[in-house]
């Protein structure tokens, strides 16, 4: 099983989602990651990858790996804010320090 951790930025983004079903769909994808099923992902550079969620406006969750077991969820967004979200995720990954 893969350990999945969330940054404060990601938690804030999730709390800001108004639609309960959207949160459920995203959480289901995160649970699949924890068992090794990443689905539709792609690298966006800077040791950051994008998890594409084919629901609503095309939600994205950005993550990085630390070692073999830990996935850090950096931030999220949708297709309309993709470029800005990628830059934010790269910055968070660069500044991330192990607690």
Placement of each model-derived feature along the sequence:
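Short, surface-exposed beta-strand/loop micro-motifs that present aromatic residues
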Residues: 60-64
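Basic, Lys/Arg-enriched alpha-helical interface segments
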Residues: 1-57, 67-71, 78-99
């Amino acid at each position: 099983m893969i350990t999945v951790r969330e940054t404060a930025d990601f938690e804030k983004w999730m709390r800001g989602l108004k639609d309960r079903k959207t949160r459920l769909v995203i959480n289901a994808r995160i649970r699949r990651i924890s068992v090794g099923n990443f689905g539709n992902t792609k690298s966006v550079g800077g040791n950051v990858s994008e998890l594409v969620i084919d629901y609503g406006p095309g939600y994205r969750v950005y993550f990085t790996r630390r070692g073999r077991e830990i996935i850090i969820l950096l931030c999220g967004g949708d297709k309309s804010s993709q470029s800005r979200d990628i830059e934010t995720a790269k910055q968070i990954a660069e500044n991330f320090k192990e607690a």
